[in-house]
Every structure is written in C-alpha cells, then in structure tokens.
UniProtKB/Swiss-Prot annotation:
Gene3D superfamilies: Rhodopsin 7-helix transmembrane proteins (1.20.1070.10). It comes from Mus musculus. This is Bombesin receptor subtype-3. GO terms for cellular component: plasma membrane. Belongs to the G-protein coupled receptor 1 family. GO terms for molecular function: bombesin receptor activity. InterPro entries: Bombesin_rcpt_3, Bombsn_rcpt-like, GPCR_Rhodpsn, GPCR_Rhodpsn_7TM. Role in sperm cell division, maturation, or function. This receptor mediates its action by association with G proteins that activate a phosphatidylinositol-calcium second messenger system. Residues 64-82, 144-163, 242-272, 334-399 are cytoplasmic.
Amino acid sequence: MSQRQSQSPNQTLISITNDTETSSSVVSNDTTHKGWTGDNSPGIEALCAIYITYAGIISVGILGNAILIKVFFKTKSMQTVPNIFITSLAFGDLLLLLTCVPVDATHYLAEGWLFGKVGCKVLSFIRLTSVGVSVFTLTILSADRYKAVVKPLERQPPNAILKTCAKAGGIWIVSMIFALPEAIFSNVYTFQDPNRNVTFESCNSYPISERLLQEIHSLLCFLVFYIIPLSIISVYYSLIARTLYKSTLNIPTEEQSHARKQIESRKRIAKTVLVLVALFALCWLPNHLLYLYHSFTYESYANHSDVPFVIIIFSRVLAFSNSCVNPFALYWLSKTFQQHFKAQLCCLKAEQPEPPLGDIPLNNLTVMGRVPATGSAHVSEISVTLFSGSSAKKGEDKV
C-alpha cells in the first residue's frame, strides 16, 4: 500500500469550509513528501495545472471584481440599491482572493503551516467572514427583489441608498460575529505521522482528535452558510414566481409604457440575482458535501482511495471560483454593465450609456421643439405626474 493510502486521519483535512488555510490537507503533505505513488497519483504536470488554475482564479477574480467596484464608484447612475449589495459582494470576493486562495496554494509544496498562530486565527476569521458576506448578501438581495417585484411601482424613499448602505454594513458585522468563534478557537496544532516518522503543524478550528467537534462544526457550517440561507432564498423566489405569474394577467397597457418597462426591469434584475444565487449554490455544494463526508467517516477516511485526488481539487477550485464569476455573470446579463466593463477593460474613459426609459424621472421632463412663427428653438419644461402623483424612481433598478 502506498504512503498516500496509509496516512493517518490527522492529514485528511481537505475542506475549504473548515480548512481553507490548513496545512494538514492530503494534497500538501503528500506533495511535500513525495507520497503520491501509484498509477493515479499526480505528478509535476498535475501540480503545474493546479498552480495555473489557482493563478487564473486569482488574476481573473481580482480583475473582474476591481472593475465592478470601480464602475460602481465612478458611475453615478450605477449607484443603485441592488448594485450596492453586488458591490459589497465584490469586496468580500476580493478579500478571499487576496488572502485565503494564495495561502491555500502553498499547501501543495510547503511543509507544515507557514503563517504562525496569529496568521491561523486571522485567516480563519477572514475566510469565514467572506463566505458569510456572500451568502447573507444574496439572501438580503433576494428579499429586496421580492419587495421590488411585489410592489413594482412603489416610490423609492429619499434615504433608500443610505439605508441600503447600512444594511450592507450590517451584513459585514453579522458575518464577522459568526466568524469570531472560528478565530478564537483556531490554533496551530503539532501532529506526528507514524508512517514517516515526521511531525508537521496544522491550523485547525479544533483538535483533530475531537471527532464530535468536527461533526458539529461541519453541520453548523453546512446549515448556517448554505442550507438555511438558500432555503430562505428559495421561499422568496417561489413568492416572486407566483407574483410574476399572477401579474401576467394584469400587465399595464401600452399607454402606460413607463410602468410596463419598470416592471420588466425589475423582473430582469430578479433573474440576475437568481443566477448569482445559483452560481453560489453550485460552486459551494461539492465542498460542503466533501467536508460532511470526511467528518462523519473519520476512521474509514484514512484510506484516501475513497475520495480521488481529482475530486478533492475540484471541490476546492470550484468553491474558490465563485469569487471570480459574479462580475462575468453581470457582464453576460446586463448590457449597461457590459458597456462600462468594456470601457474600463480597454482603459478607455467610460461613456455614460443612455438609461432605459424606466430610469428617466418623469416628473421633470424637458421637451424641445420649434416655434412655428419664428422657426427658433424653443425649450419648455413640463411636469408629468403618473400613478397618483408618484414620480418614477431614478436608476433604482439599474444593474
């Protein structure tokens, strides 16, 4: 039996949810000690492919999220309620890409934990904060889109942007509170591998020997950062689907074209948020399942043939990929963001795209024409009031 197959369970922490930055993962120790033997063991080609993939995730993710943030702060028309949440998502993704992903990449070549006790606690805190910001922001976004679809013509309050910023800040605070126990209890533990008579250090949230703690930790992570938020999102989108189905029987007439476009705009944004939620669910599911499997099959997991190396790497890469896909999903779904993204990517000054009709405030509409007697241009300003005196909301739903 190869060394890879006979390693102790102390070296089997492979979950990003629990051990994104831990050095006791199978891949890191086996790479360092050249313990990968057998027909299906990765060689130098596999390591090169892994590092190229990690470098691609980091580079593409930083570029995409940085452009998204820049577009938001430089373009006044993009500073809307849903875009505030999406920009907060981008900050969380950048945090993960700049810290936890590079640290995880060191596991494949480095011997032991390289970043000390303080680094262990700080990186554990950052990792869980970033995951919390992602899933909790998507949950709040779904609630916001439900409200927008149910009441599509409701007037935006004057302090809507300020309240949304406060909500985004609250999400960060809640995520930090959930991540605080991880930082407090994470520590660097020293282990000995009897098969190779060597010791190594690992950053973990609990002692490896505590099986019950591992099971509780994996279940809590799965529930708090996956099942519960996605269940809430599913409820909101079920209500959105029901509302949209009913609204097809009561669509505004052509004479109310502004109302029609406003409703269609909000439907489109609801679909955009749903795509972001689906990407999160897809990217993080394998990692959560693998961590649960590891936690509840502690003894049998010592035989690593149960989980092929490619599946371990796939789950890690897929989870990290979620931090770089959102800007490109927006590029695909939003023509407005696509124009700004192209301009920033080409280092050109972004031209302001013309807002759709649904984003033009109709309470202050300028009309230009010619006075027949003089032939000169004449500008008159008229006030248009629709929907019981409520004016349209400017740019609220632009993405």
